[in-house]
Every structure is written in structure tokens, then in C-alpha cells.
Amino acid sequence: MNQTIKAKLELLPDSPGCYLHKDKNGTVIYVGKAKNLKNRVRSYFHGSHNTKTELLVSEIEDLEWIVVGSNIESLVLEINLIQRYKPKYNIMLKDDKYYPFLKITNEKYPRLLVVRKVQKDGATYFGPYPDVKAANEVKRLLDRIFPFRKCGLHEKKVCFYFHIHQCLCPVVNHVDPQVFKDMTQEVKEFLTGSDKKIVNELEAKMMVSSDNMEFEQAAEYRDVIKAIGTLRTKQRVMNQDLKDRDVFGYYVDKGWMCVQVFFVRQGKLIQRDVNMFPYYNDAEEDFLTYIGQFYQDNNHMMPREIFIPQDIDKESVEAVVAASQEGNLLTKAQAKEVDAKVFTAKTLKFSDQKDVEQSIVKLDKELSAEKRLSSLLAKTQIVQPSRGEKKQLVNMATKNAQSQLQLKFDVAERDILKTTKAVENLGKILGIPKPVRIESFDNSNIMGTSPVSAMVVFIDGKPSKKDYRKYKIKTVVGADDYASMREVMTRRYSRALKEETALPDLIAMDGGAGQVNITKQVLKELGLSIPVAGMQKNDKHQTSELLFGDPLDVVPLSRQSQEFFLLTRIQDEVHRFAITFHRQLRGKNTFSSKLDGIVGLGPKRKQKLLTTFKNLKAIEEASVQEVAEADIPYEVAERVKTTLSGPIQENENWESLKDNVPLLEGKK
């Protein structure tokens, strides 16, 4: 805990509000709410915590807080702040999970579509459906009954669907728009279970067609009636009142929460939504946050009723639902004001003369959620069933949440057992003690520029990211992989000896005999005896074989074994870590070329120079005419020569310049 945090902990009020934890870069990494800010925030820095919370606390370098008037206000504000800052330790709903809906467009001559997103466009939506197949099945049936527009608005003749009675071609046939309004209402009635009227009409039409000996048309009506019956059978009716409901259940265990949502539409259970995540707050409070985020997503349509368990505060759920129905938890103006208040707090001075930002901020009264409840809750009711079928629905959601969470733990436990066994077996195969700690190294550079190396550490078969290390190559010029590895191994294990830090049980090099032998030489020079293996790749850059022993030999390992999978994970991870570091370093090392800023010399003409000359010195030594022959206008060539007449920067080379020239369209 640093001095800034210590000072701020003394300022914490006994009020409800929200707090924001930040990392060393000032990035918000966690947003929480509390009935008592002083007690809640201080609890992070005192006492013992589980592993997840300890990881969060280890990254906290600063904190802010916002004081509000009530617990409900803090709940509403917390959800807004999470959506705004997207902290990595908060619950974040998956944004790639869109269920399909049926949509009747808000047009003069509307269309019937299957879509994945609900928008505020005045259209009529039905759903969600469990998958696209189910939505399309309903749409195909509706198309056979209700001939919504399928053609364009500028057609001059009827379309194909007109001939099969699935489109009225309203533009060509000048259909009254009221016809479509009536059809839309009939679709609403049909999808809410009132299909008896439609079936009766179809049966009457079937009889008329049969009497008129129009047997094909009669068969079509018969098939549609049969399809309606089939669809009705597939959808189990959960409640006879046919209301749209979302049923929530949750379960917590071992620091994890699972939330199950059952979608009940027209009394039928059609789908469920499952989310599992670690929670750092009180379980009930994190569940409330989840509900708020759930309905802030426009893809989740607000139902007529929301069922929640008995142990959840109904008033708080009403607050977040009301805020979501309103469209935004805060208006843009209010959100900007919150930002200004959080990050423009007053400064206090303490006895140690250190300035510490005072972060007690009052939220304006207009954010009060209670004032909005009466009008907004008329649309959606929050229900806590106490008996009967409705109570059974909530219990079923809760039991499913428990089952899913237990399944996650069972799978994770099996994976741990497999990984632990793989580590033990790897030691037996190599004839060494169990390699609890494995360190792996890899180099990365392009044409010798920005050479780096990286080390990853696996403990008991799992990555220990706090032990990862990055190395900038200091003593090697150009692309010398072996010399770079010698430098890194010397630096790593000299320091380990000096500081008496943990040494690995096995070093797994990303490479073959060359890298292994260099590592062995360095270890011998340092007086260390650590087993070294080489993870060799094939021409497809995939883990191919394990080299070990003296002399080195290929260790027979099945590609389907857990030991081989472990080595593959280690090799992939060290390669990823090294190349990511290299890209970061290259980005920092970019510079402005002497060719930048020359009037008339844009990216395309720089590319032409790049393909004609090897380096800047070659351009400098060329004549104006030779530069112009590279398809550069003569006056621009003159400016190039004039600019390059000065000394070339020492660190400027053509490979670096090449990185700064955008590729021409179509070139690779």
C-alpha cells in the first residue's frame, strides 16, 4: 500500500457511494459500490483475501470515490461507471451473444425479417428465439400466412413471391398501408398464442378450395394448419397467462457466481442465458449489478415480468430496471459531470507535505432513482414468487445455476489433475525429479532490429505470469540468435545466484541443439546444474519434438499425450510473450525519417524510392535525374536531394524507414 492510498483511506466517509480502483497507469481496473465506503474500501487493504482479490489489490495504486444519497443511487451509478470504464476485474457481459428476433419493420409497407439486434427504430420485435433455425422456422410459417413485402420499393412488376402468395407487391398493386397494419396486429395475436382464429380461417379457405376442386391450394392450407400444430407442440407452455417473463436464478461457490436467465415468451420457455464469473463484492450486490448490465444491453428486450429469488432486494432491482427502461442510466450531460467530479477533485496537503487528491464528490440530486420508479415500473413488474409454478421456475433457474457452476469446477479439477500428472510423467520420462518450476526462453527480432528475449515460467504446469520477464538485448549487434541467448541466460541466472531467488527444475528452450548447448555452457560457467531440454519446431512452426540428454537425443513422446500438450502450451506461450514484447518495442522505436515532410513526397512515392534504392545514402549519392527516374516528379526529386544534403541520423536505416511507409493498396 503506497502513501497516496494510506492518506486517502483516512478520508473515506461513512456514506453510501461508488469507488474506483486504479492501476499504476491511472486506468480504472475495478468499480464497486458500498453502503459504507469507509468500511468497504478499507477492507481491501486489511485482513486475508482469496487469490482473486489478492491479485486485484496487488494492482491498486490509487483510488477515487463518489458519495451518493442512497444505496439505490450507488447501484445505478456503479452500473453506469462499469459500462463507461469497462474495468478488467468487473463483471462484463459477453457482447457477442445475440439471440435472433423476428422484426416487422417500421415502414409504409413493412417487411418481416430475422435479426440479431433490437434497435430503437419503431419496429415491432418478437423473441428472442433459441437459435436462427427456430426463428426461421417461425418466419417461414408466417410468410405462408401473412404476405408482408419482400420486394423493393421501386419495382415496376410483381416479384416471384407474389406468384406463391407470399408478397402483396404493394408498390405495383397500390395496396392500402392499413392492410399491413392489420397484418401486424394479427401476427402479434398469433405469436401470443391466439392462433385459433387463424386456424379457423385457414380451415374455411381449405374447404372452399376443395369445393372448387383447387386441390393444390387446399393442400397448401392443410400443410400450414399442420405446421401451426407442430410449432404449438414444440413450445412447452409454462404458464397459462401467456406473459413474457425473464426468470433469474443464481448460485455462488468458491468465489464464483453463476447466473441463469430463463426466457419465457407467451408462456413458453424458449431459451436460457448462462454466465459465470468471479465476484469480488457481496454476492447479492454483484447479482444486482449483473441484472443492471443485462438490461442495459439493448439486445435484451424488457419483458412484462421479471422473476427474482426471495433473498434479493426487490427495491434495488426495481431501481436498475427502471433506469434501464429509461434508456440510459445517466444522461450524457450527467455522465460528463460525473467524469469532471471524479477526476477534478480538490487537493489537500498533509503534514508530510505530499499533495493527495481529495476524492469525496457529491452526486447531484437529479440522479435520484427513486423519483423515477413510479412511472417507469408500469411497464415491467418485479416479482418474487413464493409458491406454485412461478416459484418452481425460479427454483429451476437456481438449480441449473448450481449445476453449471459445479460442472465448471469438475472440469477444472480434471484439468488440474491431468496437468499435475503430465508434470510428474515428464520428470519420469526425462529421468529427473518432478519439474515443478519450468522456465522457457525465446528470442524475437526482425532483420536484427529491436532484438529482445522473453522468459515465461510454469509452476505445476500452469503459467505463473508474475514471474515472467522481458529482456532487451544489449551486447549483440544484428540478428545473432545464439549470442542473444547467451547474454540473456547469463543475465538471468547470474542475477538469480546473486539475489538467491528460485531456480527452475527444468529449462525448456524454444529451439534445437544450438540453443540447448549455449544454455548448458552458460550454466556450467556459473556453476549451476539444471536440466535443459529443447522444444524443436517443424517447418509449420509447430512443436515437433523434445530434445534432451547428453548427447542430445529425441525423446519419444506421443503427440496425443498430456506431456506433449504441456510442452506445446509452454512453447506457444513463450513465443507469444516474446513477439508481443518485440512489437511493443518496435512501436516505441519508430522515428520520423528525413524523407518525412518533403512537399510532394507522400507514402506512394516513398514506396517507389524504397523499391529503387537500398538505403538513404544511395539516394543521397544519386543525381536528381536518377531520383526522378524512380517515377518522382523532377521538382520533388530536387527537394529530396536538398533535404538529404545534411548528415544522416545515426539510428536511421532503411529497414526502419520501410516500417514507416504504409504499404500501397494491393501490395503485401
From Swiss-Prot:
One of its GO terms (cellular component) is cytoplasm. It is found in: Cytoplasm. SMART domains: GIYc. One of its GO terms (biological process) is SOS response. Residues 14-91 form the GIY-YIG domain. It comes from the Bacteria. One of its GO terms (molecular function) is DNA binding. Residues 196-231 form the UVR domain. Belongs to the UvrC family. The UvrABC repair system catalyzes the recognition and processing of DNA lesions. UvrC both incises the 5' and 3' sides of the lesion. The N-terminal half is responsible for the 3' incision and the C-terminal half is responsible for the 5' incision. This is UvrABC system protein C. The lineage of its organism: Bacteria, Bacillati, Bacillota, Bacilli, Lactobacillales.
